[in-house]
């Protein structure tokens, strides 16, 4: 499976744009329409597998909630474990947490303390990269637990929102399958 213009266009075209959601002036990129298209979903996972196979990853970490939809099948295809990062109070075992800033306020993410080991090489995945705050907090959690994380993958990137620069400053290599500029 080759990451070419046609396959990337199929993925991008499967993502619906919803104007003025969740508030006026926002163009929401709805990845659930990609999930409804089995060809686009299979292609998305296949391209990610092709890109990341044989690189020695031991875990895929996906962020709540849409990161789970891409991270779990990716981990399964790579033959490695999947680790969810969740909002507070959603994980049953002992956790550590990391706060991060949102446009209007802050939020918190948690991970099980026994989910990542010092010898783990971790790939982080989410559906969309905007400001980078969620992935920055996720990477901090992984590094607190001693894991090595240098790669992050996204289906969608909104480059005008500054997330790419923010994450590259954390020494992360990034890939995204499609970009929506000017949003």
From Swiss-Prot:
Q: Provide any one GO MF term from the record.
A: adenine phosphoribosyltransferase activity
Protein's UniProt keywords contain Membrane: no
Q: Which GO terms describe its cellular component?
A: cytoplasm
Which keywords does the record carry?
Cytoplasm, Glycosyltransferase, Purine salvage, Transferase
Q: Name one GO biological process term.
A: purine ribonucleoside salvage
Task: List the InterPro entries hit by this protein, alphabetically.
Answer: Ade_phspho_trans, PRibTrfase_dom, PRTase-like, UPRTase/APRTase
So what does this thing catalyse? Answer: AMP + diphosphate = 5-phospho-alpha-D-ribose 1-diphosphate + adenine
Q: State its location(s).
A: Cytoplasm
This protein's pathway: Purine metabolism; AMP biosynthesis via salvage pathway; AMP from adenine: step 1/1
Q: List, alphabetically, the Pfam families matched.
A: Pribosyltran (PF00156)
The EC number of this protein is: 2.4.2.7
Signal peptide region: none
Q: What class of enzyme is it?
A: transferase
Q: How does it assemble?
A: Homodimer.
Which family, according to the similarity comment? Answer: Belongs to the purine/pyrimidine phosphoribosyltransferase family.
Q: What does this protein do?
A: Catalyzes a salvage reaction resulting in the formation of AMP, that is energically less costly than de novo synthesis.
According to UniProt, the name of this protein is: Adenine phosphoribosyltransferase
Q: What is the lineage of its organism?
A: Bacteria, Pseudomonadati, Pseudomonadota, Gammaproteobacteria, Alteromonadales
Q: Which gene encodes it?
A: apt
